[in-house]
Amino acid sequence: PGTYLQDRYEILSLIGTGGMSEVYQAKCHTLNRLVAIKVLKDEYSQDANFVSKFKMEAQAAAGLSHPNIVSVYDVVDEGSLHYIVMELIEGITLKSYILKKGHLGVKETIGIAIQVAQGLAAAHDQHIVHRDIKPQNMIISRDGKVKVADFGIARAVSSQTIGVNAVGSVHYISPEQAKGNYSDG
């Protein structure tokens, strides 16, 4: 907190931590708005492979503009510091929401699923496959809007990229992928 990035973004607080990155709430003083900043962890910032994957996430998501997808505003490399500036969603992950409520009714579940499907369809229309769909990567805003986040292992799909590699979180990949069979991305 209190740290500035690019003399523009003031870090306010840590929102969450993932395997490769930490996400902070920040204030953009140029546009006078709150944003989320996803920072690649230090232990990965010198690894060209991780830096490349991190940039690919930003590039995959940056071209997507849809009410059910978290918007990417900027991607920045400052020496060994790599970060993505994104839309800040005031809310909680679908995983936290489910744990908090304990049970979701059919109507609510369908409403959430429709919003997720609309976001994924918009990504697919741009030939982007998310490849890591799980409750932790869905954010529900305070007003009930569901947004797909974390395109970290997304892939631009063409006939050359369709393969048999299993990619995703082990608890959420399809049985076909787990067996090493055909996968569309």
What do the predicted segments below correspond to?
Residues 12-18, 23:
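Protein kinase glycine-rich loop
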Residues 118-128:
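Protein kinase catalytic-loop region centered on the HRD/HxD motif
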Residues 112-113:
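Activation segment signature within eukaryotic-like protein kinase domains
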Residues 41-63:
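AlphaC helix of the eukaryotic protein kinase fold
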Residues 27-34:
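Conserved N-lobe loop of protein kinases adjacent to the ATP-binding glycine-rich P-loop
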Residues 79-93, 97:
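Conserved short submotifs of the Hanks-type protein kinase catalytic core
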Residues 75:
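Activation-segment/catalytic-loop signature of the eukaryotic protein kinase fold
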